[in-house]
Amino acid sequence: MSANGTAAAAPPHSLLASGVPLAGRYLVRERLGRGSAAEVFRAADLEGGPDVAVKIAAAGGRKQHQRIRNEAAVLARFSHPSIVSLVDQGVVEVSGSHAGRPYLVEELALGASFAEVIRAERPGAGDVALWARGLFGALAHLHAGGLVHRDIKPANLMLSGLRRSPVRIIDFGTAAATRSAPEPGISSGTVHYMSPEQASGGTVAPSWDVYSMGLVLLELLTGTKAFPGTAIESLVARTLRSPDVPEYLGDWVPLLRSLTAMDPTERPTAGEAAAMAARLIPGVPSARRGMPAVRGRADPGPCPAGGALPFRRHRQQA
């Protein structure tokens, strides 16, 4: 999509220009995003279902194709109100520039990404607490299943447009097993949101996601990145200190400081963080906010967020 909201022009022989339904079912309407790993399209379900997001591997080789297959495998295994749901998957058989590429069909989130929320306005602390409860609940479910997302950042967190579960985590292409070793020559994550140990190439751990989510929440609440500057400046800064958490954030300060502790053993689990975030939601009776946080295995059960949110137009990231 272009900046003014009009559909980007489709290259000749592309799936968008062909007018031929993908798998005989999904009629591509517009391109929503394009990145180095994939293109994302909005498509109509000709069998009467709601519109969906179609994610097709970018041209370029094995790495891009493997990310799509990896994401499909993760989404097929995990179901949670705050994890985007998988609808279908396959390989593009329509002739043209997309032929032979793997694709997946996902639930279409109808809201903005957190990256767009940060650019547009600073959301209320109550809304952020509501979102955090759902997102940490989703991470707890993922971690209990032995996986780590590895690329938690504003562009990979979406508003769904739904009241009962208003947030979604997307893009599981670089998810990896807990305690696995980094692949030589394969980078994961986004520099400005990596934990210090992820940036140094340590063993994959759930604490990576917890730290990254802490930086995202801090940015939502303050409007600025915790570690600005170039990639190198950002990486060096986090190896020397924890991010600054302004005192004006009040009750958020203890949570944010624990999430972004330099020592990963001092961070809460995602399940504990979900309970801590729930206690920051205004107007929610204490009995509904969850029990006090207790150290232990992340809770794999659903933790749906609730409450009404402003409707925003979807712009999914590739």
What are these regions (language model features)?
Residues V28-G35, V40:
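Protein kinase glycine-rich loop
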Residues A44-D51:
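Conserved N-lobe loop of protein kinases adjacent to the ATP-binding glycine-rich P-loop
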Residues A58-R77:
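AlphaC helix of the eukaryotic protein kinase fold
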Residues S85-G100:
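Short beta-strand micro-motifs within the conserved protein kinase catalytic domain, predominantly
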Residues G96-S113:
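Conserved short submotifs of the Hanks-type protein kinase catalytic core
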Residues W131-A132:
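Activation segment signature within eukaryotic-like protein kinase domains
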Residues L135-L147:
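Protein kinase catalytic-loop region centered on the HRD/HxD motif
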